[in-house]
């Protein structure tokens, strides 16, 4: 069997473990030397203090025994070296072994993984042997359970083990090799590696990947491409978003007279259409925003003020962003009831259209709808469905978002109304969507998720929902079919994502549900 390179992370890990074992066992095994003094007969407080000669009788001393201590250390060293050597030999011989894909999560040099394995019929005490392997590599066990075997072999055990553990990334290959030596059918229930996603709201600081497709510095067709003053202004406002961290108040922007004039033209033009084209939820929230959050034609509302308004209404908060975010990062923010919102405004030469999201689009289109409880939940559900989803599913969810949150229609009082932010912030498309020209289809998440769309001109197809509640129910049904090795739940108290990947995690979540049910039952009892 080839000897592993002494410089590999696995070999270094073994040497460290052996060194620690030497120290621990040296303390645990008390060995008395040949010339050590015997017990004192005079009651001297100091071991080894000589008693008077007349009363002292030397006692025979046992010969020093070091064989067992040396044997333990030598056995441990050989065992670890053998495991490293076995891992070094096994990895190249298994080219199809998905060692790198088995990690569920990686952070600070540690890999967290889920494993399933079955005991070998020829080796008793398979679980204790596997646990010994985990101890060898100083793995931290998060969860361990036995399960009925999903694919028992003829004459083999009908039991398998599931373990979730954390181990140094450099020791992963050797640990897996060690588990294979004492058990069989070692595999990961999670399958392919799950993409990283934020677990805490503060981790949204990492969700800042921008799409530069419509950046005025790069897009030749952008209205502001040839305007150096506008481009410099955009960079100045974008820096606010780049410096922002969760928990900070959103810095205020002093808008120029030209920017306010652009806002005024958009504001007054669209407001004239809302009464006949916008849904009731938008109209109700818009009136409240005018009353409490500085919405008026001669003032561009500040994000901090609007964020406080939304927080009180539906729990949603705003967060400044420098431009168009990647779909994965943007949808992940919605899972925490956080909406990434731009602060810059479109170019003055094109007030009725912007190739990218700007504050007119966000404040006039998105914010009023996020003030509605049912719609806010619908938006968060899309975000929750995106966490840990594959790239293919992210593309479908972002398309679904496009045809609902951005360009969705709904039925109200026998009429079709607009609720999508892309419609409510675009005068031309708001007229177009309710004309006879486009095709109107009943909302079906499966169809909407794969429907081709336009981002350069008006849509040729729109989807109409019976109600927001109906759309929410259909979305949840669609999301339940997304393949993930876990489910997720938002904790509104800690603003964190609970990953439901074990019976214990589900049980903890149910305890909170039971508390809420008890409160509601008590309320009904008091009312009755």
UniProtKB/Swiss-Prot annotation:
<keyword id="KW-0127">Catecholamine biosynthesis</keyword>
<dbReference type="GO" id="GO:0001963">
    <property type="term" value="P:synaptic transmission, dopaminergic"/>
</dbReference>
<dbReference type="GO" id="GO:0042755">
    <property type="term" value="P:eating behavior"/>
</dbReference>
<dbReference type="GO" id="GO:0043473">
    <property type="term" value="P:pigmentation"/>
</dbReference>
<dbReference type="InterPro" id="IPR036951">
    <property type="entry name" value="ArAA_hydroxylase_sf"/>
</dbReference>
<dbReference type="GO" id="GO:0004511">
    <property type="term" value="F:tyrosine 3-monooxygenase activity"/>
</dbReference>
<dbReference type="InterPro" id="IPR018301">
    <property type="entry name" value="ArAA_hydroxylase_Fe/CU_BS"/>
</dbReference>
<dbReference type="GO" id="GO:0033162">
    <property type="term" value="C:melanosome membrane"/>
</dbReference>
<comment type="similarity">
    <text>Belongs to the biopterin-dependent aromatic amino acid hydroxylase family.</text>
</comment>
<keyword id="KW-0908">Parkinsonism</keyword>
<dbReference type="GO" id="GO:0019899">
    <property type="term" value="F:enzyme binding"/>
</dbReference>
<keyword id="KW-0530">Neurotransmitter biosynthesis</keyword>
<dbReference type="GO" id="GO:0043005">
    <property type="term" value="C:neuron projection"/>
</dbReference>
<feature type="modified residue" description="Phosphoserine">
    <location>
        <position position="502"/>
    </location>
</feature>
<keyword id="KW-0503">Monooxygenase</keyword>
<dbReference type="GO" id="GO:0048596">
    <property type="term" value="P:embryonic camera-type eye morphogenesis"/>
</dbReference>
<dbReference type="GO" id="GO:0042421">
    <property type="term" value="P:norepinephrine biosynthetic process"/>
</dbReference>
<keyword id="KW-1023">Dystonia</keyword>
<dbReference type="GO" id="GO:0031410">
    <property type="term" value="C:cytoplasmic vesicle"/>
</dbReference>
<dbReference type="InterPro" id="IPR001273">
    <property type="entry name" value="ArAA_hydroxylase"/>
</dbReference>
<dbReference type="GO" id="GO:0005506">
    <property type="term" value="F:iron ion binding"/>
</dbReference>
<keyword id="KW-0408">Iron</keyword>
<keyword id="KW-0907">Parkinson disease</keyword>
<feature type="site" description="Important for substrate specificity">
    <location>
        <position position="455"/>
    </location>
</feature>
<keyword id="KW-0770">Synapse</keyword>
<keyword id="KW-0539">Nucleus</keyword>
<dbReference type="InterPro" id="IPR045865">
    <property type="entry name" value="ACT-like_dom_sf"/>
</dbReference>
<keyword id="KW-0963">Cytoplasm</keyword>
<feature type="modified residue" description="Phosphoserine; by CaMK2">
    <location>
        <position position="19"/>
    </location>
</feature>
<dbReference type="GO" id="GO:0005737">
    <property type="term" value="C:cytoplasm"/>
</dbReference>
<dbReference type="GO" id="GO:1990384">
    <property type="term" value="P:hyaloid vascular plexus regression"/>
</dbReference>
<comment type="function">
    <text>Catalyzes the conversion of L-tyrosine to L-dihydroxyphenylalanine (L-Dopa), the rate-limiting step in the biosynthesis of catecholamines, dopamine, noradrenaline, and adrenaline. Uses tetrahydrobiopterin and molecular oxygen to convert tyrosine to L-Dopa. In addition to tyrosine, is able to catalyze the hydroxylation of phenylalanine and tryptophan with lower specificity. Positively regulates the regression of retinal hyaloid vessels during postnatal development.</text>
</comment>
<dbReference type="GO" id="GO:0008021">
    <property type="term" value="C:synaptic vesicle"/>
</dbReference>
<dbReference type="GO" id="GO:0043204">
    <property type="term" value="C:perikaryon"/>
</dbReference>
<dbReference type="InterPro" id="IPR005962">
    <property type="entry name" value="Tyr_3_mOase"/>
</dbReference>
<dbReference type="GO" id="GO:0042418">
    <property type="term" value="P:epinephrine biosynthetic process"/>
</dbReference>
<feature type="region of interest" description="Disordered">
    <location>
        <begin position="33"/>
        <end position="65"/>
    </location>
</feature>
<keyword id="KW-0560">Oxidoreductase</keyword>
<dbReference type="GO" id="GO:0007626">
    <property type="term" value="P:locomotory behavior"/>
</dbReference>
<dbReference type="GO" id="GO:0008016">
    <property type="term" value="P:regulation of heart contraction"/>
</dbReference>
<dbReference type="Pfam" id="PF12549">
    <property type="entry name" value="TOH_N"/>
</dbReference>
<dbReference type="InterPro" id="IPR019773">
    <property type="entry name" value="Tyrosine_3-monooxygenase-like"/>
</dbReference>
């Amino acid at each position: 069997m080839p000897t592993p390179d002494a410089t590999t992370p696995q070999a270094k890990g073994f040497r460290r473990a052996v060194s620690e074992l030497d120290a621990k066992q040296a303390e645990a095994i008390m060995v008395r030397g040949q010339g050590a003094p015997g017990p004192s007969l005079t009651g001297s407080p100091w071991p080894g203090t000589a008693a008077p000669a007349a009363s002292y009788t030397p006692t025979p001393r046992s010969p020093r025994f070091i064989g067992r201590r040396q044997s333990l250390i030598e056995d441990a060293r050989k065992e670890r070296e053998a495991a490293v050597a076995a891992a070094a030999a096994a990895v190249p011989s298994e080219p199809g072994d998905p060692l790198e894909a088995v990690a569920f999560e990686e952070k600070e040099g540690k890999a967290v993984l889920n494993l399933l394995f079955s005991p070998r019929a020829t080796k008793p005490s398979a679980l204790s042997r596997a646990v010994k392997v985990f101890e060898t590599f100083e793995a931290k066990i998060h969860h361990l359970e036995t399960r009925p075997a999903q694919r028992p072999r003829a004459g083999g055990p009908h039991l398998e083990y599931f373990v979730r553990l954390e181990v140094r990334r450099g020791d992963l290959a050797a640990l897996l090799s060690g588990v294979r030596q004492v058990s069989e059918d070692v595999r990961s229930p999670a399958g392919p590696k799950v993409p990283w996603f934020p677990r805490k709201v503060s981790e949204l600081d990492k969700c800042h990947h921008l799409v530069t497709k419509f950046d005025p510095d790069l897009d030749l067709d952008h209205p502001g491409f040839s305007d150096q003053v506008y481009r410099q202004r955009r960079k100045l406002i974008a820096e606010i978003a780049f410096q922002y961290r969760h928990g900070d108040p959103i810095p205020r922007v002093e808008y120029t007279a030209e920017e306010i004039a652009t806002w005024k033209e958009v504001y007054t033009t669209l407001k004239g259409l809302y009464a006949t084209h916008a849904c009731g939820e938008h109209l109700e929230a818009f009136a409240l925003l005018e009353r409490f959050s500085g919405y008026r034609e001669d003032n561009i509302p500040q994000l901090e003020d609007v964020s406080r308004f939304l927080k009180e209404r539906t729990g949603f908060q705003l967060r400044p962003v420098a431009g168009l975010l990647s779909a994965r990062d943007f949808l992940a923010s919605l899972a925490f009831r956080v909406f990434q919102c731009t602060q810059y405004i479109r170019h003055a030469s094109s007030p009725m259209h912007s190739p990218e999201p700007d504050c007119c689009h966000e404040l006039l289109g998105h914010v009023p709808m996020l003030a509605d409880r049912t719609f806010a939940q619908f938006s968060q559900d899309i975000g929750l469905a995106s966490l840990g989803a594959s790239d293919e599913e992210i593309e479908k969810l972002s398309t679904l978002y496009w045809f609902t949150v951005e360009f969705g229609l709904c039925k109200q009082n026998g009429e079709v109304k607009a609720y999508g932010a892309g419609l409510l912030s675009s005068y031309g498309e708001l007229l177009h969507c309710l004309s006879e020209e486009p095709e109107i289809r009943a909302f079906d998440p499966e169809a909407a998720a794969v429907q081709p769309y336009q981002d350069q001109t008006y849509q040729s197809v729109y989807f109409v929902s019976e109600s927001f509640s109906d759309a929410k129910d259909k979305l949840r049904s669609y999301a339940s079919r997304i393949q993930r090795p876990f489910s997720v739940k938002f904790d509104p108290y800690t603003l964190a994502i609970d990953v439901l990947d074990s019976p214990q995690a589900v049980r903890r979540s149910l305890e909170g549900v039971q508390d809420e049910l008890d409160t509601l039952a008590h309320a009904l009892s008091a009312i009755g």
